[in-house]
Curated annotation (Swiss-Prot):
Keywords: Cell membrane, Membrane, Protein transport, Translocation, Transmembrane, Transmembrane helix, Transport. The chain crosses the membrane at residues 1-21, 54-74. Pfam families: SecG (PF03840). InterPro entries: SecG. This is Protein-export membrane protein SecG. One of its GO terms (biological process) is protein secretion. Its main location: membrane. It is a multi-pass membrane protein. It is found in: Cell membrane. One of its GO terms (cellular component) is plasma membrane. Involved in protein export. Participates in an early event of protein translocation.
Length: 100
């Protein structure tokens, strides 16, 4: 489960980076690579709104996924600690001398 969520987390991070770099800035950034001011079928305002909404959605998914991963990781760590404590207690009980 953690492996799947980690893969999703990395995928969201890459998509988030791409969407942020595609957004228009003062110097047009990487968005100028796609053809500059070619308005074609879709207007620049529509593309800007889509990229803004995509950024918000991806950021929300990224944060939720990060919180879920952190919770699962802490539970897994506490399970491991409790198993180690159990093993140590069993070894301590077995190492005591037997009275005859």
């Amino acid at each position: 489960m953690i492996e799947i969520l980690l893969f999703v987390h990395i995928t969201i991070a890459v998509l988030l980076i791409i969407v942020i770099l595609m957004q228009r800035s003062g110097s047009d950034g990487i968005s100028s690579i796609s053809g500059g001011n070619n308005m074609g079928v879709v207007s620049a305002k529509t593309v800007g709104n889509f990229l803004t909404k995509s950024t918000i959605i991806l950021t929300t998914l990224f944060l939720i996924n990060a919180i879920v991963l952190a919770n699962l990781s802490s539970k897994k760590k506490s399970d491991l600690v409790s198993k180690i404590n159990e093993i140590e207690e069993n070894q301590a009980e077995n190492s005591l001398p037997i009275a005859k």
